[in-house]
């Protein structure tokens, strides 16, 4: 009889322990999510995000000095528009069109010049 009571008591204590742990974790979650708990002494030292409108870009564009052509996508200063670099050269290929303009397109698969081949197929209406 004593052993059975001992098991019941241990089970009840473990149940209370799990309940208390879960409740504390839940309150810590809400405290973190909603900034509660009166722990507002800690400050967030992360860098601030850029604005969600075009003000950051416009400010940099307006302050960029270029005597030739200022590329709108990269703010690079080049002699002619089709010399503008791609914004993401690691994942984009630049393809110069015959009319003095250029486009940047996602790099193709595993073959060299695959992106250029796809542009030519598209120009011919085959893609």
Swiss-Prot record:
Domain of life from the UniProt record: Eukaryota
InterPro entries: LCL2
PANTHER family referenced in this protein's UniProt entry, alphabetically: LONG CHRONOLOGICAL LIFESPAN PROTEIN 2 (PTHR38425:SF1)
Protein name, entry field: Long chronological lifespan protein 2
Protein family per UniProt: Belongs to the LCL2 family.
Organism field: Paracoccidioides brasiliensis (strain Pb03)
GO BP, sorted A to Z: ERAD pathway
Xref: CDD domains: LCL2-like
Swiss-Prot/TrEMBL keywords: Signal
């Amino acid at each position: 009889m004593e052993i059975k009571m001992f098991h019941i008591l241990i089970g009840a204590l473990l149940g209370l322990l799990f309940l208390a742990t879960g409740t504390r974790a839940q309150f810590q979650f809400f405290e973190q999510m909603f900034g509660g708990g009166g722990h507002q002494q800690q400050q967030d030292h992360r860098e601030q995000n850029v604005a969600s409108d075009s003000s950051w870009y416009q400010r940099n564009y307006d302050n960029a000095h270029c005597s030739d052509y200022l590329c709108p996508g990269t703010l690079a200063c080049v002699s002619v528009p089709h010399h503008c670099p791609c914004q993401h050269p690691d994942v984009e290929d630049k393809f110069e069109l015959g009319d003095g303009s250029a486009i940047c397109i996602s790099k193709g698969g595993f073959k060299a010049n695959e992106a250029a081949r796809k542009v030519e197929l598209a120009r011919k209406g085959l893609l």
